[in-house]
Amino acid sequence: MTFSVEQVRADFPVLNREVNGQPLVYLDSAASAQKPEAVIGAEAEFYRHGYAAVHRGIHTLSAEATARMEAVRQQAATFLNAGSAEEVVFVRGTTEGINLVANSWGNANVGAGDNIIISEMEHHANIVPWQMLCARVGAELRVIPLNPDGTLQLDVVPGLFDPRTRLLAITEVSNVLGTENPLAALIALAHQHGAKVLVDGAQAVMHHPVDVQALGCDFYVFSAHKLYGPTGIGVLYARSELLQTMAPWEGGGSMIATVSLTEGTTWNQAPWRFEAGTPNTGGIIGLGAALTYVSQLGLTQIAEYEQTLMRYALDALRAVPDLILYGPAQRKGVIAFNLGQHHAYDVGSFLDNYGIAVRTGHHCAMPLMARYQVPAMCRASLAMYNTTEEVDRLVAGLQRIRKLLG
């Protein structure tokens, strides 16, 4: 189908509101995307007419809710082209998915003297769990450095691997720079050395199709709320042969097969043994609606529109005097910048006065801020509902701020 940004915008109620007397320009989707009516309505309908506890009842509502939840598991598997629905674990989000792998697979497979490789551009969620694991077991955390343009120093990467490398944990798309990493080559290199690969897909799944089998990764994680879905729900994909060997890291209801005070506890099958307690079923229903929504629009069509918009935005922003852009020319989703020597918080506050929402701060990427020797950056993120007119308003706002602040 032909992509129409006007039709897409009509599906998002919040885009009709004003902020500080100005029409809202929402350029913070990389932090959390807005929700279409289809997602809002699906979750509301579930709570109005179909809510019940799943996997716990023989009555009709429970059976229906369970079937709907498991249908979304299959939908997520199809979305990622996983081998089966049983390779999909529902988690609270990308952060929990990474922590699950670190505390389950990591505790069993990483030991003293081993090493894990990450990159300098990672979000804290793909740094801190590995730091914690390395501290627990006496392993080493190795870091792929960046070039000045925000791409990986690929010539350094082979030298970081050795026979004790257990994992490469790498983002697909940087949440600050928009850098799209060459996953196929990195995954192949890691596997040559016997290491597993976890991909942080939080900033990727909304921008292009993802095929985990084609990538060959061992783990892949993403959050629904960046994919136009609800907060509090995400997906961990794990290859079946790995997931079947992993122990649960949280205990409680649903994740057990049997519990005995004298003989101990046995675990449920994967993936359910990783889903302790009552799940966020409403969020799962909303995730399913979000997957349906973007799939019907077509991620290839979305990618084409967004890349055209990105080129327009970069060209327009390069014309703003004193504007410092960070990241490579070819990027996805985000544009990080500073305006001269003015603090990012000041610039972001002025933009908010003009009805323009951008993110300011370290973006949960403090090592990356240190790499560029700045305390903070502004970040404008472009989603499928943004327009060239909104880019023009951002540019005009920055021009105005420059005149006001000097």
From Swiss-Prot:
InterPro entries tied to this protein: Aminotrans_V_dom (IPR000192), Aminotrans_V_PyrdxlP_BS (IPR020578), Cys_dSase_SufS (IPR010970), PyrdxlP-dep_Trfase (IPR015424), PyrdxlP-dep_Trfase_major (IPR015421), PyrdxlP-dep_Trfase_small (IPR015422)
Catalytic activity: (sulfur carrier)-H + L-cysteine = (sulfur carrier)-SH + L-alanine; L-selenocysteine + AH2 = hydrogenselenide + L-alanine + A + H(+)
Enzyme Commission number(s) from the entry: 2.8.1.7, 4.4.1.16
Compartmental location: Cytoplasm
Swiss-Prot/TrEMBL cofactor(s): pyridoxal 5'-phosphate
Modified residues (N6-(pyridoxal phosphate)lysine): 226
GO molecular function term, any single one: cysteine desulfurase activity
Gene Ontology cellular-component terms listed: cytoplasm
Short name of any one Pfam family annotated for the protein: Aminotran_5
A single GO BP: cysteine metabolic process
Family note: Belongs to the class-V pyridoxal-phosphate-dependent aminotransferase family. Csd subfamily.
Function (record text): Cysteine desulfurases mobilize the sulfur from L-cysteine to yield L-alanine, an essential step in sulfur metabolism for biosynthesis of a variety of sulfur-containing biomolecules. Component of the suf operon, which is activated and required under specific conditions such as oxidative stress and iron limitation. Acts as a potent selenocysteine lyase in vitro, that mobilizes selenium from L-selenocysteine. Selenocysteine lyase activity is however unsure in vivo.
Self-association and partners: Homodimer. Interacts with SufE and the SufBCD complex composed of SufB, SufC and SufD. The interaction with SufE is required to mediate the direct transfer of the sulfur atom from the S-sulfanylcysteine.
Protein name: Cysteine desulfurase
Gene that encodes it: sufS
